[in-house]
Each structure stands twice: as C-alpha cells, then as structure tokens.
Design a protein with these regions (language model features):
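Hydrophobic alpha-helical membrane-interfacial segments at the cytosolic entry of transmembrane helices
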Residues: 65-68, 100-125, 140-145, 208-220, ...
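Extracytoplasmic
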Residues: 139, 298-447
Length: 447
C-alpha cells in the first residue's frame, strides 16, 4: 500500500500513513480463523503496477500487475472475483483517458489478459470440474446468510480494544467497521480530489483518481450486501447486483461469503485517505503536518488494535495416539485415514487429525472444509456398518491409501456413533486380514 499511495500522491508521508491504515484495518480482528482472508496484500501491489503502466507505458509495470494479480487470486479465490472489479474500474477509467494517445495499450492489455487466463487454465479447470462432478456450489440461501447488512460498516468486532464496548457488535463475517479515522480521511480525500491544489497538480488527474477509488468503494459495498441487500434488517430489494452476477459468472456460485467483498471498500477508502492526508498536508505548515501525521498514525493503530481470544491447540497429546504417530512417521510415504471419521466435536477433532500430519508426515484423507467430499460422505454413511469394511478397505486400497489409524477412545455415545463402536470396528477391520499387510496396536489406537 505504501508503494501505491506514494505513487498516487507523490508523498511518502501519505504513503506511510496509508500503509499503516491498511496494515491495521479493524477488519483483521475476526479473521484469525480464516487467515486466507487476510491475504490481500497483493492488491495494492497490482494496482501500483497497473497505474505505473498507464502513466509510463512500460511493459515491466504491466508484468508487475499481472504477476501480483495472479498471486493475489491464488492466495484466496474470493479475490479473483472481487479484486477483478477494482481492476476493471481502474482499467476502464484510465483507458478512456489515455487510449487516444497510446492505442497500442489495447493490444498490450488484451495480450496480458490472454496470458493470465492461459496461466490459470490448470487451476480453473480443476476447480470447475471438481465443482461440477461433486455438485459443489453454494446456495443462494447460504450467500444471503453470509451477506453484510448496510449497517455492518458501523458494527465492530467484539475483539476490538477501542470500539467493542461502544459500537454495536457484528457477526464474525459482518463486523466491517473500517475506523472513523479512515472514513474521515477518505471523505476529505474524495472532496479534496475535486479541488484546486496549490502545488500545481493536474486537477483532472486527481479528480479521476478520486472517482475511480470511490467507484471501487461503492462496488465493494454493494457486492458485500449479497443477493438480497438489507438496511438494519429491512429488505431493500429481492435481487441485488450480486444475485445477477451469481447467475452468470462461472465459479461465483462457489463463494460462500459475499461480505468479503468489503475488502474493496477498505482498499478504496485507504487510497482516498492517502489523498486526504496529502491534501491536508499541503495546507499546513511542515511542523503541524508532521504532528498531525504522527497522531493520525497512532489513531489508525489504536482503532485496529484487538485482543485475540485463542484456545490453546493442540491439547495434551494422548499417549496411544502419540505412539501411533511416532511409528507412522518412520514408515514409507503413503496416504492415511484416521477413524472415527466423525468423532465427537467433528471440527475440533478433525483439525487435530490434520494437525497430527506435522508429526507423522503422511498425507491425510481426513480434512475439514465447508464442503464434504463424496469419499468422506461414503465413509460416514457406512462407518458403523461392520459388514461394509471389506468393500471399504478395497476402495481405500484402490485410492492408494496405505495406512488406516483407528482411535477407539474417540468413539463416544453420540447420535452418529456409540462408545462400543470402536472395538467392533477394529475387530471388523482385523477380520479382513487378507487385505492387511500388518497390524500394530498402541494402547487404544490401532494402525
């Protein structure tokens, strides 16, 4: 963000403050469980390259944009879609201004777009094929559930130190308060971009930037409201722009949380705030500007400060599991599956299984996602059917799963399993001796 804001304003002070604001967004407070949502740092780098290309015509800058855009999208698939909106806005506005003097831009931009699409074919093809083959898509009702209300931008995370007891608390995906300092400076930047600058800057160029980033804010805001935009819980329309795009853009039905389009709001506000900082700085004495910048940086940091409530993980290891994983670590590489596949508290225990791969180093069938694979669903369906383990083991062998780990102590009396299932299932697997290379017992864990 420092690069982008500095290149736009010509001021290192404005760039530094924009970088601080973007790094300390209050939005971060609820996103520790979804670290991939915080991987938005390539956006300003890409836009920096994009602006440089339009201002200089250098193809190296266009390459920087393309690489940063791809890195951003591959870091988080949501941003392939949402960040594309920002790129389209900047590209459209800049082309309207510059294409008449440099028509070759159209050819260069088209060639770059084709190369970017070609580089994404392996990932996009796999993504779309898996989605089609396993019917992996997010329903409209899910999108509505994870959309932001218009007032969510004044709802604070309960983790925020400064605002949690003052502002209304929002849901984890809908606590979108950007901070009053950022909002104020962005408003000053938007208005200031249409005024005459004392240092002789091109007022048309500054106005163009102000309009561009305001459009990015507006688009992000509208998209974050999801298929059925609401204000204070009141339905504004039964079908909004996100709903229209949902039906025509390939792969968009794989996104669950429209509220994450708010990153465009924060991106646009930060750039506008940088313009606002520079606008005020040119109106003040150097000493006053320095004090003001220092105070503003402190406010950005204070508004974005939060206290994370983390649960210690992993818990104290169970000796039998530890012994099983120690043994597994010494074995040749091969796929592994750990039973029960739906232990008590599925999310926490499945994550424990995934965490165990750091110890035993074997690739794991188990995993947690918003989606369930057909393999996991099949195993869940037949896990308690001891007569099905002959076919189950044959299927796992066909998939080159080499190790099966069973923890008897993780079977509990629940709706989907009973405490007595562990020994029964262990016996059913051992009865398939002709399909087993070896069996090892570690307390209440079998491998």
């Amino acid at each position: 963000m420092y690069l982008l804001a500095t290149s736009i304003t010509g001021s290192r002070a404005a760039g530094l403050l924009a970088g601080i604001a973007f790094a300390f967004l209050p939005y971060r407070a609820d996103k520790i469980p979804h670290l991939q949502v915080l991987m938005y740092g390539w956006m300003p780098v890409a836009l920096w390259g994009f602006h440089r290309y339009f201002s200089t015509g250098h193809r190296l800058a266009l390459t920087v944009f393309a690489v940063a855009f791809l890195l951003q999208g591959l870091s988080n698939g949501y941003f392939f879609y949402f960040f594309s909106a920002a790129v389209i806005v900047i590209g459209f506005v800049e082309l309207l201004t510059r294409v008449w003097t440099r028509p070759r831009m159209i050819v260069e931009l088209a060639a770059t777009a084709v190369l970017m699409l070609v580089s994404l074919i392996p990932v996009a093809t796999a993504y779309l094929n898996v989605g089609a083959n396993q019917a992996l898509s997010r329903s409209r009702s899910e999108n509505i559930m994870f959309s932001a209300d218009a007032l969510a931008y004044f709802h604070a995370s309960p983790n925020l130190v400064l605002w949690r007891d003052i502002l209304p608390q929002g849901a984890p995906e809908a606590s979108l308060f950007p901070g009053f300092a950022l909002l104020t400076m962005a408003l000053i930047g938007l208005l200031g971009s249409f005024t005459k600058w004392r240092d002789g800057r091109n007022p048309y160029a500054m106005a163009r930037l102000g309009v561009s980033y305001f459009l990015i804010v507006l688009i992000g805001f509208v998209l974050s409201l999801g298929p059925e935009p609401t204000y204070a819980g009141t339905l504004l329309t039964e079908s909004g722009p996100y709903d229209w795009l949902y039906n025509i853009v390939p792969g968009l039905d794989g996104l669950r949380v429209p509220a994450r389009a708010a990153i465009l709001v924060f991106l646009g506000l930060t750039v506008l705030a940088a313009i606002g900082v520079e606008r005020l700085r040119t109106l003040c004495s150097p000493r006053l500007a320095g004090v003001g910048c220092f105070m503003l940086a402190a406010i950005f940091i204070a508004e974005g400060s939060y206290q994370a409530k983390l649960i210690p993980f992993p818990q104290t290891p169970i000796p039998s599991e530890q012994a099983a994983y120690d043994w597994l670590e010494q074995q040749p590489p091969g796929g592994a599956i750990i039973l029960p596949i739906r232990p008590r508290d599925p999310i926490v225990n499945t994550l424990r299984y995934v965490y165990s791969t750091l110890q035993h180093r074997q690739p794991l069938v188990n995993g947690y996602s918003g989606y369930g694979t057909s393999l996991i669903r099949s195993i869940e369906t037949h896990e308690r059917d001891v007569s099905a383990y002959g076919d189950l083991l044959r299927g796992l062998r066909a998939l080159q799963v080499r190790y099966l780990v069973l923890h008897e102590h993780r079977y509990e009396d629940q709706a989907w399993m009973q405490q007595t299932d562990g020994p029964l299932i262990s016996a059913a697997i051992r009865a398939q001796a002709h399909q087993l290379v070896a069996h090892h017992r570690f307390g209440t864990s079998d491998v």
